Amino acid sequence: MRERFLSPLGIPCQKPPFGTMSAVDLKSGKLVWQVPVGTVEDTGPLGIRMHMPIPVGMPTLGASLSTQSGLLFFAGTQDFYLRAFDTATGKEIWKDRLPVGSQSGPMTYVSPKTGKQYIIINAGGARQSPDRGDYVIAYALPDKK
């Protein structure tokens, strides 16, 4: 979403959602689920943050990562969260606040010593936010039961 889609006050000129996460069945080509992703918590008109986690679905600016265990991780919205979704339903099942926004796709690795799987995200700042940083954050996935 560039300025051509915004009013002079910086407000989008179309109705929400402005960004969604979608799952498509690759065999049938049918949409399985679609959910708005992102809030206006860290954005607002005239560059003033709203500080309200209203889930309107914000423009998405990064890649997602799905795991074999049925989790989909995504951080590329204009608020400062890494989210995990259930790949079967699209339900947001976890989120954590990042120090600044991220337009990075999450990465994963498994420790060769412990066998534990980690999700890593780079957070350097989100478009339309003056906040910048230089963070690499790792989260450990729960052990398999």
Located regions from the model:
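A fold-level detector for beta-propeller and closely related beta-sheet-rich head/sensor domains
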Residues: M1-K145
